[in-house]
Curated annotation (Swiss-Prot):
It comes from the Archaea. HAMAP family: Thi4. GO terms for biological process: thiamine biosynthetic process; thiamine diphosphate biosynthetic process; thiazole biosynthetic process. Fe cation binds at residues 154, 169. NAD(+) binds at residues 33, 52-53, 60, 124, 152-154, 219. Its cofactor is Fe(2+). It comes from Pyrobaculum arsenaticum (strain DSM 13514 / JCM 11321 / PZ6). This is Thiamine thiazole synthase. Keywords: Iron, Metal-binding, NAD, Thiamine biosynthesis, Transferase. Pathway: Cofactor biosynthesis; thiamine diphosphate biosynthesis. Homooctamer; tetramer of dimers. InterPro entries: FAD/NAD-bd_sf, Thi4_fam, Thi4_prok. It holds the Pfam family Thi4. It catalyses: hydrogen sulfide + glycine + NAD(+) = ADP-5-ethyl-4-methylthiazole-2-carboxylate + nicotinamide + 3 H2O + H(+).
Length: 261
């Protein structure tokens, strides 16, 4: 029995890694913006892979309300909540409360049911680039426990037509790209202190392409563009995820058309 269990895990696990070594879109971070983007891109028929460094979904949703079992979204994000069948309760002044556990579960299920693949426990170590001027063309990754151990282990590769940084406050993928491929011309001022009303609008407004092949969504937008943080309100995160899905889908469709022309 043990032999059959082990072989089944090894066979299927390696098949998954092989199949997803080349994708349309690689999203780094399974938080609210990353999962939202994954669902809307997968629904459009793109091959979507999400890498998450933890062994759980949700990013900052779970502890978001200072560990209380409630978080807030604003009215503009309600259509997304309805898409994912997430329940919400009015809290006044255009704000609504949501159960963080329900939001985590349904964002993840929505992305998976739409066809996105999520691989947990992965640390993205670097980017792949091509061309002059350069374009981001994929990711280098290792398992998170290896990265945490400090041992030197060479990473594996995933090629992608588009890479989305949804890693949150530190914009980890874009930070690496800015440091190691300076020809991309990326500046990273870091996020500012809290101003929730302004940040919720600006994070969505500034969501988009950072460099050829490289995109940003969610709190990473604040780090890249020097915007204020917002705290435990999550509507902007989901709106940013939906917007980046629309931008990437449009760019990939235009690139595919150009190749056929």
């Amino acid at each position: 029995m043990e032999l059959k269990i082990g072989r089944a895990i090894i066979k299927k696990g390696l098949e998954v890694l092989y199949e997803y070594s080349d994708v349309d879109v690689a999203i780094v971070g399974a938080g609210p913006s990353g999962l939202t983007a994954a669902r809307y891109l997968a629904e459009k028929g793109f091959k979507v892979l999400v890498f998450e460094r933890r062994f759980s979904f949700g990013g900052g949703i779970g502890p978001g309300g200072n560990m209380l079992p409630s978080i807030v979204v604003q009215e503009e994000a309600l259509p997304i909540l309805r898409d994912f069948k997430v329940r919400y309760q009015p809290a006044g002044d255009g704000l609504y409360t949501v159960d963080p556990a329900e939001l985590i579960a349904k964002l993840a299920a929505g992305a998976i049911d739409a066809g996105a693949k999520i691989i947990l426990g992965v640390h993205v170590d670097d980017v792949i680039f091509r061309g002059d001027p350069p374009r981001v063309a994929g990711l280098l990754w290792i398992w998170t426990p290896i990265q945490m151990s400090g041992m030197h282990v060479d990473p594996l590769y995933t090629m992608a037509k588009a890479v989305i940084d949804a890693t949150g406050h530190d914009a980890e993928v874009i930070s690496v790209a800015a440091r190691k491929v300076p020809e991309l011309g990326i500046q990273l001022p870091g996020e500012k202190s809290a101003w929730s009303e302004v940040s919720e609008k600006l994070v969505v407004e500034y969501t988009g392409k950072v460099a050829p092949g490289l995109y940003v969504t969610g709190m990473a937008v604040a780090a890249v563009h020097g915007l204020p943080r917002m705290g435990p309100i999550f509507g902007g995160m989901m709106l940013s995820g939906k917007k980046i899905a629309e931008i990437v889908a449009k760019d990939l469709a235009e690139e595919a058309y150009a190749l056929r022309a």
